[in-house]
């Protein structure tokens, strides 16, 4: 096969991949539109109770009303708390994972505690955290960190331990220090592990923030959901849930962009 034929086949292959991506996106949008149309139709025909389930037109009306009544403030509060909790949970989790990888003794001592903490429902710690930290933003951020921290430690530590043993043996043969093994082998080999941690943590941090806002906040999307439920404004609840889904999707998309950037940078190094 000559170079021209190979280039043509590659272009055809890439074109098919692009077409498949567009087809997937189009199908997703079509499903969403059909779902919303069916929801609106069933509510208008009173087949479902719009007071309980709301409907797209009422949600849109609620959204436009919220836009003129501090909606951006509520979105910003939840986003800010999530980002702080996400960054702290990820950073502390990776640092602790490195410390545990460095010290086999500490790793074995902490293992049962980490397993117990991981299986413990973190939301149940909410009242304790509020008493310790106080009601307000700090308590919400601590809850976000508490939910994401242990998962980050376990996932990264597992990645460090499973790093190619032959590479580490070779480095030891050349009398590399533990720090050199960490920076030259462990960390570069676990970029995908770090990225996976980010993907998981953005969702976990948001869960922690919303749980905290349910308990103590007077602003944020979690607060809007609780308030809407208390005064039986189901339109407000559904609108807040949808906005929350959009915020979560945008945050996850940001992590995917970061992943592409890191992999692209690594590829051309």
Predicted regions located by residue number:
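Membrane-cytosol interface at the C-terminal ends of specific transmembrane alpha-helices
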Residues: 104, 137-201
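Periplasmic/extracellular loop-to-transmembrane helix junction in inner-membrane transport proteins
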Residues: 13-17, 45-87
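Hydrophobic transmembrane alpha-helices
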Residues: 38, 113-120, 131-132, 142-156, ...
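Transmembrane-helix boundary motif in ABC transporter permease subunits
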Residues: 84-114
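N-terminal signal-anchor/first transmembrane alpha helix
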Residues: 12-43
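C-terminal transmembrane helix and the adjacent membrane-cytosol boundary/short C-terminal tail
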Residues: 104, 238-269
């Amino acid at each position: 096969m000559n170079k021209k034929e190979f280039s043509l086949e590659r272009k055809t292959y890439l074109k098919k991949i692009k077409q498949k991506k567009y087809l997937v996106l189009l199908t997703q949008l079509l499903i969403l539109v059909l779902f919303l149309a069916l929801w609106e139709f069933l509510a208008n025909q009173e087949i479902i109770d719009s007071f309980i389930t709301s409907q797209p037109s009422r949600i849109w009306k609620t959204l436009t009303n919220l836009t003129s009544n501090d909606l951006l403030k509520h979105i910003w509060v939840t986003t800010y708390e999530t980002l702080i909790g996400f960054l702290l949970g990820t950073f502390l989790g990776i640092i602790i994972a490195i410390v545990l990888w460095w010290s086999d003794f500490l790793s074995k001592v902490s293992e049962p505690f980490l397993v117990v903490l991981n299986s413990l429902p973190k939301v149940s710690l909410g009242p304790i955290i509020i008493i310790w930290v106080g009601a307000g933003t700090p308590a919400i951020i601590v809850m976000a960190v508490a939910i994401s921290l242990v998962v980050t430690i376990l996932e990264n530590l597992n990645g460090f331990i499973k790093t190619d043993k032959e590479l580490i043996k070779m480095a030891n043969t050349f009398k590399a220090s533990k720090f050199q093994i960490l920076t030259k082998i462990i960390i570069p080999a676990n970029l995908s592990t770090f990225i996976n941690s980010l993907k998981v943590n953005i969702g976990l941090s948001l869960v922690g923030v919303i749980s905290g806002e349910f308990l103590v906040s007077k602003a944020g999307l979690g607060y809007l959901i609780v308030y809407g439920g208390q005064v039986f404004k189901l339109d407000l609840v559904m609108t807040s849930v949808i906005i929350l889904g959009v915020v979560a999707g945008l945050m996850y998309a940001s992590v995917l962009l970061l992943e592409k950037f890191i992999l692209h940078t690594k590829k051309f190094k």
